[in-house]
Amino acid sequence: MSLLSKIAMWAELLGSGEAKQRMLIGRQLAWRVRELESINEFADVEFSVFSQFGDDGIIQWLIHRLPGLSETFVEFGVGCYQEANTRFLLVNNNWRGLVLDSSRRKVHAISRDTISLLHDLQSVCAVVTAENIDQLMLDRGFEGDIGLLHIDIDGNDYWVWRG
């Protein structure tokens, strides 16, 4: 085994351990957050496992406060889906999801990620517009109420949401 192969193997093992620790800590924080009946501000429940900021905690608090939510999500503009607002929801709460990005390379990376094999996650390469979003969701079995819709497509968020 070459030195480079050994380094790659150790990097993967260490990365895997870090991911497990992040998930375990995230699950503990999610349990703490869901028990809070009220908060003064969203900062009271913020934590980040996969989100860029504290959105994982805010989402966990909200989904336990809003009765009757469909356990489905749609997120656009996800990149490679490593840092995303719905990833913790998928892994921790086992929601069903659809993620979309305009980069074929990034969507291919998502489809090859073990998260796509272990969870009910569909990834689609598409340029999302107000005109095509409904059909993109319908074509993949996402109709009716969506528990969480997350739009991050710099500059067109409002128009797609209105669509």
Language-model region placement:
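A short, conserved alpha-helix within the catalytic core of class I
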Residues: G155-G163
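SAM cofactor-binding core of SAM-dependent methyltransferases
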Residues: A43-D139, E143-I151
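Membrane-proximal basic amphipathic "stem/tether" segments
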Residues: M1-A43
